Amino acid sequence: MTATLAAAADIATMVSGSSGLAAARLLSRSFLLPQNGIRHCSYTASRQHLYVDKNTKIICQGFTGKQGTFHSQQALEYGTKLVGGTTPGKGGQTHLGLPVFNTVKEAKEQTGATASVIYVPPPFAAAAINEAIEAEIPLVVCITEGIPQQDMVRVKHKLLRQEKTRLIGPNCPGVINPGECKIGIMPGHIHKKGRIGIVSRSGTLTYEAVHQTTQVGLGQSLCVGIGGDPFNGTDFIDCLEIFLNDSATEGIILIGEIGGNAEENAAEFLKQHNSGPNSKPVVSFIAGLTAPPGRRMGHAGAIIAGGKGGAKEKISALQSAGVVVSMSPAQLGTTIYKEFEKRKML
């Protein structure tokens, strides 16, 4: 079995039910496409768009809805450069003092937006992502939870065939550069500009790591919540590459959970790219150590199936890459602080 077909087989075990098998079959077809001359490696070029700052111009899809309105207000209060939003049929109106457009394409042309955040109900969220991809928005952050998995397989297939748009999520808290730009639902006040890059599959555990690194005085350089769904647009490796190449990021916290093999892949990446005297300290926590096989634990992707995806295997893989694994989420801040102390980086 080729590596690509093996990846599709892993997904079949990760997603339960007939919809999961159908999704895996569909994704396996997309994996086979490179044999027909279609390039998929180009999507990695969009990693650069993960870095947001005070100059990032954002639109909101689902702008006038309840969630879109609330979180757009929060973003504006934080100082994020929100320039407008879309709600089909409400183009030409204003909302929160900003213009409303019918389409993402129109919004991008009129505002020069470089990012979009999506607060659209699950049945329509995949179409919203596709619209942003077609408009070539550089960064798309989809907060929505509960998008049908087959919808996301089709979105991922579309993503992998282009290089202009980078997707974070779905089912994620978003991305934040403290003090500069907040795209998503994270509480802004717990963040502090600093030295730690945080990437996580869990939203609430992200906030825990943020609060602790703020408390120990290290702060955060960039925080990315990649989401807990099995078919997402950004994984650990995408974020790790940004962190390793970012001079402002001096240490990394990686928060994983049971299900899939993203943590094992991240460990392999760190072995290859973060070793030697100039390596950056990496601390991790893996949620679900006591989870029983076959039972989904919260997130759609958090399930041990087919003998794969267990916490112990993930912890071993990360430790073999030189990562310090904390056994408690309450100790992430003190653990990374001790690593800085040990390396005389304080």
From Swiss-Prot:
Reactions catalysed: succinate + ATP + CoA = succinyl-CoA + ADP + phosphate; GTP + succinate + CoA = succinyl-CoA + GDP + phosphate
CC per GO annotation: mitochondrial matrix; mitochondrion; succinate-CoA ligase complex (ADP-forming); succinate-CoA ligase complex (GDP-forming)
Enzyme Commission number: 6.2.1.4, 6.2.1.5
Compartments in which it is found: Mitochondrion
Binding site for CoA: 64-67, 90, 143-145
GO molecular function, one term: RNA binding
Transit peptide location on this chain: 1-40
Functional pathway: Carbohydrate metabolism; tricarboxylic acid cycle; succinate from succinyl-CoA (ligase route): step 1/1
Disease: Mitochondrial DNA depletion syndrome 9: A severe disorder due to mitochondrial dysfunction. It is characterized by infantile onset of hypotonia, lactic acidosis, severe psychomotor retardation, progressive neurologic deterioration, and excretion of methylmalonic acid.
Function as written in the Swiss-Prot or TrEMBL entry: Succinyl-CoA synthetase functions in the citric acid cycle (TCA), coupling the hydrolysis of succinyl-CoA to the synthesis of either ATP or GTP and thus represents the only step of substrate-level phosphorylation in the TCA. The alpha subunit of the enzyme binds the substrates coenzyme A and phosphate, while succinate binding and specificity for either ATP or GTP is provided by different beta subunits.
The protein's name in its UniProt record: Succinate--CoA ligase [ADP/GDP-forming] subunit alpha, mitochondrial
Record organism: Homo sapiens
Classification of source organism: Eukaryota, Metazoa, Chordata, Craniata, Vertebrata
